[in-house]
Swiss-Prot record:
The gene is ndhB1. One of its GO terms (biological process) is photosynthesis, light reaction. This is NAD(P)H-quinone oxidoreductase subunit 2 A, chloroplastic. InterPro entries: NADH-Q_OxRdtase_suN/2 (IPR010096), ND/Mrp_TM (IPR001750), Ndh2_N (IPR045693). NDH shuttles electrons from NAD(P)H:plastoquinone, via FMN and iron-sulfur (Fe-S) centers, to quinones in the photosynthetic chain and possibly in a chloroplast respiratory chain. The immediate electron acceptor for the enzyme in this species is believed to be plastoquinone. Couples the redox reaction to proton translocation, and thus conserves the redox energy in a proton gradient. It comes from Lactuca sativa (Garden lettuce).
Length: 510
């Protein structure tokens, strides 16, 4: 009799939970429609992989790319709608979150064509690769709209788990296994630090988990200036710092960049920074509203260290991927300036604009590296010597992307940095802007050093890799070159296109 009653109670409780979940999905599901499209694409990929004996590679890529494009389209149709909070306060949709979701979808859409020939040449499992990329994209999108501490913790873990698997995807490569182990250990440590910071925030606010409710809780408990909030700020900054990889939280970046497959590095180098930047702006701006001076100081220190160390160490690198790793550390220092400025003086707008240009510049550079690596089998900088004599198109594309990363006019990177530094100067961050200008000059030096190698015609400097260079006859090259062309064009657009981009970015302020 007792067992029968307990069984009935269990069934009733399960039914209530199911009905509540169904109610949430029915009434709030439209607010995560872009994410649902990607989930449907994931299910479709799994069904095809489990029912088909022979893998139809073009069809798998078509499904992945189509789901991403459809998700972008649904996101654009929702633009300028009223901000809404759904799923019992766990998720928020507004223009600010959606622009970051758009950037993540754009990254994934451009990264998938980069991986076509690479996966074929390395004989990697195609379906699993696409599943991990789409799942990481979903995790990044949920992180952009996360409105409570639990979702802010779970969403990046979804992204991180897929990132660990992608970085170790070439299991026979010792460097890839080493990169995965370092990435996993550092990621686990940072997650524990982050959740410890959340526990301090949760306790200080009186048990609140929603971001705005945490602010109200801190006011009610009079704990907004307590030592507990300072401890929470330090731990959360360290935890988020791992995702952004500024100095001194950058130790994992060079090894993971060098050991991971190049298309994976291209994906991680942009999506992780976009998602982490979106999360950082909301966490610092809302729960730590009363501690703005403290987190401004912390981020200023991180920005200075990142810009100086990242660009100085990049000069000494001999591997193209390690050089780009340290370059990305310097680039995130520039992005942090926009986070510090905030919604005043167009700080967020300048950060979004620069990140859009950074996506095109960085992915364009990695597209060139993928092509060169597949045709020569090397990633050393010195092996690029004389590439212009064999493949002028690839050499010029790489040169334009590198010059744009350095911020030379009239390329897109120059106008992005100009807008970012101008907003920082208007906000009174004179020292940060001066450091940014000086380190930008340093970055131009090592970018020009590579371009000089590309254009050299001396036979004694040209390595056997370039002497024996042959353009691959495979048709799949067209997808990599298509992504490269799109990124190069976006990296070289003139300043005349800046006004509409800035106007769109300014509309995202919450």
């Amino acid at each position: 009799m007792i067992w029968h009653v307990q069984n009935e109670n269990f069934i009733l409780d399960s039914t209530r939970i199911f009905m509540k979940a169904f109610h949430l999905l029915l009434f709030d599901g439209s607010l995560i429609f872009p994410e649902c499209i990607l989930i449907f694409g994931l299910i479709l990929l799994l069904m095809i992989d489990s029912t088909s004996d022979q893998k139809d590679i073009p069809w798998l890529y078509f499904i992945s790319s189509t789901s991403l494009v459809m998700s972008i389209t649904s996101l654009l149709f929702r633009w300028r709608e009223e901000p809404m909070i759904s799923f019992s306060g766990n998720f928020q949709t507004n223009n600010f979150n959606e622009i970051f979701q758009f950037l993540i979808l754009l990254c994934s859409t451009l990264c998938i064509p980069l991986s076509v020939e690479y996966i074929e040449c390395t004989e990697m499992a195609i379906t699993e690769f696409l599943l991990f990329v789409l799942t990481a994209t979903i995790g990044g999108m949920f992180l952009c709209g996360a409105n409570d501490l639990i979702t802010i913790f779970v969403a990046p873990e979804c992204f991180s788990l897929c990132s660990y698997l992608l970085s170790g995807y070439t299991k026979k490569d010792v460097r890839s296994n080493e990169a995965t182990m370092k990435y996993l250990l550092m990621g686990g440590a940072s997650s524990s630090i982050l959740v410890h910071g959340f526990s301090w925030l949760y306790g200080s606010s009186g048990g609140e988990i929603e971001l705005q409710e945490i602010v109200n809780g801190l006011i009610n408990t009079q704990m907004y200036n307590s030592p507990g909030i300072s401890i929470a700020l330090i731990f959360i900054t360290v935890g988020i710092g791992f995702k952004l990889s500024p100095a001194p939280s950058h130790q994992w970046t060079p090894d993971v960049y060098e050991g991971s497959p190049t298309p994976v590095v291209a994906f991680l180098s942009v999506t992780s920074k976009v998602a982490a930047s979106a999360s950082a702006t909301r966490i610092f701006d809302i729960p730590f509203y009363f501690s703005s001076n403290e987190w401004h100081l912390l981020l200023e220190i991180l920005a200075i260290l990142s810009m100086i160390l990242g660009n100085l160490i990049a000069i000494t690198q001999t591997s193209m991927k390690r050089m780009l790793a340290y370059s990305s550390i310097g680039q995130i220092g520039y992005v942090i300036i926009g986070i510090i400025v905030g919604d005043s003086n167009d700080g967020y707008a300048s950060m979004i604009t620069y990140m859009l240009f950074y996506i095109s510049m960085n992915l364009g550079t990695f597209a060139c590296i993928v092509l060169f690596g597949l045709r020569t089998g090397t990633e050393n900088i010195r092996d690029y010597a004389g590439l212009y004599t064999k493949d002028p198109f690839l050499a010029l594309s790489l040169a334009l992307c590198l010059l744009s990363l350095g911020g030379l006019p009239p390329l897109a990177g120059f106008f992005g940095k100009l807008y970012l530094f101008w907003c920082g100067w208007q906000a009174g961050l004179y020292f940060l802007v001066l450091i940014g200008l000086l380190t930008s000059v340093v970055s131009i030096y090592y970018y020009l050093k590579i371009i000089k190698l590309l254009m050299t015609g001396r036979n004694q400097e040209i390595t056997p890799h370039v002497r024996n260079y042959r353009r691959s006859p495979l048709r799949s090259n067209n997808s990599i070159e298509l992504s490269m062309i799109v990124c190069v064009i976006a990296s070289t657009i003139p300043g005349i296109s800046m006004n509409p981009i800035i106007a769109i970015a300014q509309d995202t302020l919450f």
